[in-house]
Regions:
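Intrinsically disordered, low-complexity terminal regulatory regions
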Residues: 1-85, 89-147
Length: 147
């Protein structure tokens, strides 16, 4: 990532980097709730389900600020079920890129929810792995751009 990141992204990415050891990715369990307090409302956990062409992304946890930005709570839902078909590639591509590269991915986007606030959002996607190698979850921080 070449562009400068907002301070919150720098901090959470710094924590993620500290937990990457010997080429292994951190696991979800490396981020207990009490260590996530500064970012709690802006955190989303997304699970990678399946493999190959059948990979889907299920939302496991959604912070309260993200619910506000999106205008709904997507906990337990698959992203491809809530994203309009004409926007799926744009919204899901950063998750694929993050899983393939095993590296953080930043992007800016507009929510596709009709109930969402009408402003640009920024997202940092960090890969997580229970075995240290295979990406099985993502720690996602989402903030309103320009705030």
């Amino acid at each position: 990532m070449s562009q400068p990141l907002r301070a919150e992204f720098e901090a959470i990415q710094g924590r993620w980097k500290e937990l990457c050891r010997n080429g292994h990715l951190p696991a979800r369990s490396d981020f207990p709730a009490e260590t996530m307090t500064p970012w709690m409302g802006h955190i989303q956990i997304v699970e990678r389900v399946g493999d190959g062409d059948s990979v889907r992304h299920r939302v496991r946890l959604v912070g309260t600020r993200i619910v506000y930005y999106e205008g709904r709570d997507n906990t337990g839902l698959f992203l491809d079920d809530v994203i309009p078909i004409d926007q799926r590639d744009e919204i899901l591509e950063p998750y694929r890129r993050c899983a393939d590269s095993r590296a953080p991915v930043y992007n800016a986007f507009y929510s596709c929810s009709e109930a969402a606030i009408s402003s640009q959002l920024e997202r940092l996607i960090l890969p997580l792995s229970a075995d240290g190698k295979t990406v099985d979850q993502f720690l996602v921080a989402i903030y309103r751009a320009g705030t």
